[in-house]
Amino acid sequence: MSDYVELLKRGGNEAIKINPPTGADFHITSRGSDWLFTVFCVNLLFGVILVPLMFRKPVKDRFVYYTAIAPNLFMSIAYFTMASNLGWIPVRAKYNHVQTSTQKEHPGYRQIFYARYVGWFLAFPWPIIQMSLLGGTPLWQIAFNVGMTEIFTVCWLIAACVHSTYKWGYYTIGIGAAIVVCISLMTTTFNLVKARGKDVSNVFITFMSVIMFLWLIAYPTCFGITDGGNVLQPDSATIFYGIIDLLILSILPVLFMPLANYLGIERLGLIFDEEPAEHVGPVAEKKMPSPASFKSSDSDSSIKEKLKLKKKHKKDKKKAKKAKKAKKAKKAQEEEEDVATDSE
């Protein structure tokens, strides 16, 4: 019995023991690591389910699946890294709200997970791309939205790693970039969405309401009391961040798939035809083209034009011949009438 108990003890989460948080006064414990592993499992589960479902669809219908699989897999990697107590640096806190009895300096050093921000950099653009696709937003506008989203993640990464109050400058720039993306989606994209029907507009408004609440209210609040303001312990911070990340970067992208299918993939313009390759295998030896091949390379439209011109030319020729014959017959008739008149 004692051996069984020892085995169970050894089978627990030992990430903190194997990868100790050396140099950090405020860091996650085994409880925080357990929660991070839970979020990792949810993200990975969605990815594992969606990949086989994607392969059941034709290649041209898979783009919607890509937009849901990508953020889940990216965040699963980020959360596995954080749960393993890796991908972090100790940063001296600016504010002395959280304290421990073992810290040597005040404020102490807080554990900052840069792995989270790397995950955001890779995953955050996908919900924005999904919203852009609902309205058929032009490609360059989508690229602009994605670029501003990346500015948000980079600014917050720098803000989390900076000790001085200059961190709030990067924090503000990041929020500004997020606001610009939301304005772009609620103006340019929403005008395009309205043209596609009320049902598409309702889906867009619902999704954007959730995204804007989480992005412009929940995330700034969370950062302000965790990595920025050092108010919450890292364990509490992982729970706060984990819930928001699951909602915006995991659940929303997955929900987009059935809704897109309900609205109609073709209607949303999310079907991409791919022509099969003409040549497979070794490249054949090139030969000089013959004159006949140049003739056969004419486009269908030019051939049709030539045929039409030929037919028209033939018709005109026939009409001219008929007119000539009629003229000759008329002339002969007039001559006969003149001869008859002279004989009388």
UniProtKB/Swiss-Prot annotation:
It comes from the Eukaryota. The modification Phosphothreonine is found at T341. CDD domains: 7tm_YRO2_fungal-like. Gene3D superfamilies: Rhodopsin 7-helix transmembrane proteins. Residues 282-344 are annotated as: Disordered. SMART domains: Bac_rhodopsin. The keyword Membrane applies. It is found in: Membrane. Residues 307-330 have a biased composition (Basic residues). The keyword NAD does not apply. Residues 1-34, 84-119, 163-172, 224-238 are extracellular. It holds the Pfam family Bac_rhodopsin. Present with 1950 molecules/cell in log phase SD medium. This is Protein YRO2.
